[in-house]
Amino acid sequence: YRSRPILYNDWEGCMFDFNQRTLLRLAKSAKNLGCELFVLDDGWFGNKHPRNNDDAGLGDWETNHTKLPEGIGQLVREATAQGIRFGIWLEPEMVNARSELYENHPDWIIHQPGRELDDTRNRKQLILDLSNPKVQDFVFGVVDRTMTENPGIAYIKWDCNRFMTNAGSYYLPKDKQSHIFIEYARGLYKVLDRVREKYPDTYIMLCSGGGGRFDPGMLYYMPQIWASDDTDAA
């Protein structure tokens, strides 16, 4: 058993509009308020398709060089030097149509062939098909690369901001299309097993538009839930 850290999340304060100086100033203020952890939320990634709004960049998990020219690692080091731990936001199950990931792997999404892309409506994002072992490897790789390239990250906010619609799989055979829901869950659990095996001591908080995944299966892997998105900056 460990007590959960008191944290400050930058999302409500600046959303997509930030730079390194802004974040470090917020981290210092959070420390002065008594917070133990500073969490960088959405907007830190994407270069060809910068994550400056929710239209683009999701799936391209490399640090945005314009906002953070010295990288995530420098933020971790400076926050740690100020006496506050550092956490980061990921939504590795999702992708925007405006992303290099989708451009390179359009067959990795959940989608009924022959229908229009169903990315309008839930933050303009699509769901990656976790029934596909290649997608499972990619999603694990997002987490693993983020952690190994930025030593000192103590916390992950794992988000999931849309539900499954237009459900179809380019990976599953025709006679297994109705299995996409359960095969997706099994694929996700395989990824989380790998994450927990390699990073057993990392805090992982689950968010899904708030408490949209508040269930025992996910609590097994992520014992902390973001109960509601109905929040403010302070």
Q: Model features per residue range: what roles?
A:
Residues 3-141, 150, 155:
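Aromatic-lined carbohydrate-binding/catalytic grooves of carbohydrate-active enzymes
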Residues 64-71, 81, 103-234:
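Active-site neighborhood of glycoside hydrolase catalytic domains
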